[in-house]
């Protein structure tokens, strides 16, 4: 039976992870190791300055107290799930992780940690907060396909699903990340003692929404699958930097 380590960044009680766990348990052994609270936007943060405590729920799910998604996958793989998983799955996130959003996403980071530790990994996000059953069904279909024929790319699959009934999903597209304009908004308030409080504003407006992007696919009713990689090296820029350094020596 397929062994799945399941995590997220919305917290262990979030409807996305619970809906997905129920669907996956129809054909796989699932161990949830997830934050005890919402840790959205935590990216790849790893807790190094304090100890981590866990709470094991009556059904065997494990909540990591004040843990990040990366903490959860690290602990799940290296300490809490035995035997180790066959694959790491993160989600279902309440809201999309498209374009530049993947930089900040705890959902994507959990999958990234799984891949970094040597396991196949999926990040799953719903473009809304209604049709979690659709996202769960799509995820199960993809996992069954991977079980039948493993995808040997060494990449993370970042999956974004339109917030639609399953019957209205048009298909699946392999995409690249689109991009947004830089975010600029900060909201400032004052507390009753006159101290300034700052709230980070919404993401920037979409910029690159070409037909081959994740933005376009989801907007048009398609599931978007974008392969992502742990290696952030910009290989195409190496010669440019070499030439720049050489010119400095002249």
UniProtKB/Swiss-Prot annotation:
It is found in: Cytoplasm. Its EC number is 3.1.3.5, 3.1.3.6, 3.6.1.11. It catalyses: a ribonucleoside 5'-phosphate + H2O = a ribonucleoside + phosphate; a ribonucleoside 3'-phosphate + H2O = a ribonucleoside + phosphate; [phosphate](n) + H2O = [phosphate](n-1) + phosphate + H(+). Signal peptide: none annotated. A divalent metal cation binds at residues 9-10, 40, 93. Binds 1 divalent metal cation per subunit. The keyword Cytoplasm applies. Its main location: cytoplasm. It comes from the Bacteria. One of its GO terms (cellular component) is cytoplasm. Keywords: Cytoplasm, Hydrolase, Metal-binding, Nucleotide-binding. GO terms for molecular function: 3'-nucleotidase activity; 5'-nucleotidase activity; exopolyphosphatase activity; metal ion binding; nucleotide binding. Its cofactor is a divalent metal cation. Belongs to the SurE nucleotidase family. Nucleotidase with a broad substrate specificity as it can dephosphorylate various ribo- and deoxyribonucleoside 5'-monophosphates and ribonucleoside 3'-monophosphates with highest affinity to 3'-AMP. Also hydrolyzes polyphosphate (exopolyphosphatase activity) with the preference for short-chain-length substrates (P20-25). Might be involved in the regulation of dNTP and NTP pools, and in the turnover of 3'-mononucleotides produced by numerous intracellular RNases (T1, T2, and F) during the degradation of various RNAs. This is 5'/3'-nucleotidase SurE. It comes from Yersinia enterocolitica serotype O:8 / biotype 1B (strain NCTC 13174 / 8081). The gene is surE.
